[in-house]
Amino acid sequence: MRRILLIPFIVHTALASAQDTIPLNDLSFWKPNEVQNWKIVADVTADLEEDDAMKPTKGTGVVANLPTTKNRNNLISVAEYGDVEVSFDFMMARNSNSGFYLQGRYEVQLFDSWGQQHPAFSDCAGIYARRRWNPDAELFDGHAPRLNACLAPGLWQHLEIAFQAPRFDATGKKIANARLLKVVLNGATVHENLELTGPTGGPISEQEATKGPFMIQGDHGPVAFRNFHIVDKSGEPVNVGKFTYKVINGNFRYPEDFANKKADKTGTTDQLTWEVAGKNDGFANIFNGSFTAPKTGNHHIVLQAAGKSSLLIDGKEILGDQWTYVADQRSADITLSKGPHTIEIVNYKMDGWMSPFLGLWIAAPGAGPTALHSMGSVLALEASDPITLDAAKPTVFRSFMDVTLPNSVRGDKNFLNIKNPNSKRVVHAVQEGDPTRLHYTYDLDNGAVVQLWKGDFLNTSPMWDNRGDGSSRPRGAILPLDDIQTVVTKDRLFDLTTAQNDPVHGFKPLGYDLDEMGYPTFRYTLSGTEIADKIRVSAGKTLNRSLTFTNGAQNSAAQVVRLAVGKKIEKSGDNLWTVDDKRYFIQTTGGAKPVLESTGGISVLFLPANSNVEWTILW
């Protein structure tokens, strides 16, 4: 049976559109507040052990809510927004509670939900419920996040929201509900195309409107924000005219193969669609049309086509002739003057195994993307449903894993040079899934934990669908680490290459053993020393590592254990350290005193190797 699938896409234009960055040098972006619970500070820290404990440092760049019994007002923006994209970093104190309101009416919950296994609408990034008629009435219509991507209190987290305001007719009657087009917490999509039937609990008004201010709750507990970026999407979109088209039948490799051929079919169409060809492959479609830019400024173009395609505006090549897979998007930014512009789109395809697809979006300054294609043109045939693997019990899964490495030095043969220069395919990777929904990838070639993630376990479609490529993908919020040896000789403390580049000391993986519960302990040798790397997850919050050195332990005297590598590592408490601007915590046990050394912009936190070294990653 063939299934028709609308390939999922959301055209992101925020990074390419004009952004407003809220300058947190003062509180001028926000309405004057009679009480003083909101402060401009340089940074904050939150205690992992004490509820509602947050301490500021003097300076600018962060806005923090530090409520007292008397001072606990909300923060409301001066500016009002309709359709908008907004992103920011935030930090929660332990067991603290806040909320970010779109238009002062629709709350995205902010809460210390660290380790919560089954999140509700009241957990972090949940959409808070509505109340019937009065503040004391029952709750209804709340929306829990798809997964719990919340980090530990005291760490900076990141939230991205794409919001579409409700629509009203000329009489003021609501004709379309507000929508959250997408909500992303710490890199994990937690809501998508979510309809909001009305204001959630605690709004500035139950009456909906075309525009409204941002509001941040300040009456519950300490919370801090920084790096606010706003893209107002309420502007006028481009106006698109009709298209003429030519269809040339045949299998073509290059534009010159059909440049001088007579068209087999011509016509006009209101919207772009590959369907004018009348078949799925063996065609070249050439479209010519026009659109009107509502004002002068940057326009963001996104083209998604199966096969080869190109795009010209006013006769200038914007996207050159290039082959792309059906799900791949290409984009460009171009400054256009107000008024009419010509456009030409070429799409030719001879790949019978791939479904046809043609989509084009243009976002004018301050407006969302306008689709120039028909809905039928962005439907594709998909052979199978996603193949996923869950971890109802401790689960070990072997596959390739593509990872992003923040600090590793390029040069390893497995680095990928395509889209992300710091991405790498780990070929001897072990994926360990835990029922508490904190999982990790271990590289047997380096004795390294290269990433952690929160949420569901694996998407194995890349491995098992059709021919596959042997890889799997995490399903959740990811903490990238580095694919470098955990244990090295002291002279290699700042060597961020892999064990393959250290043949002298003889790193040799020995595989892993499983205990009675199914948890692995990894084993390898280095300079004649046998090392057992026991890794256990606790409560979905922490990853605990214990290294035991045996046989040839005299050689371990010259070795060190790298607990963390980063650009910025700071001590934040007894046996507690933060890495890379509070991205995650490192905690040592047993009275061990880690050493911190830095050079060339890289810091390493390490302990001398002895019979046993233990530490914990809190994230």
Mark where each language-model region is.
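Bacterial Sec-dependent N-terminal signal peptides
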Residues: 1-19
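Carbohydrate-interacting regions of secretory-pathway proteins
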Residues: 19-260, 266-274, 279-288, 292, ...
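Beta-strand-rich N-terminal accessory domains
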Residues: 20, 78, 379-544, 555-583, ...
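Short, well-ordered beta-strand segments enriched in hydrophobic/aromatic residues
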Residues: 86, 90, 543-551
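Short, hydrophobic/aromatic-enriched beta-strand segments in well-ordered soluble domains
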Residues: 90, 160-163, 344-348, 522-526, ...
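Short strand-turn-strand beta-turns centered on an Asx-Gly dipeptide
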Residues: 176, 184-188, 192, 304, ...
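Acidic/polar, compositionally biased interaction segments
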Residues: 194, 234-393
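Solvent-exposed beta-strand/loop surfaces of large extracellular or lumenal domains
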Residues: 194-204, 271, 313-332, 570-605
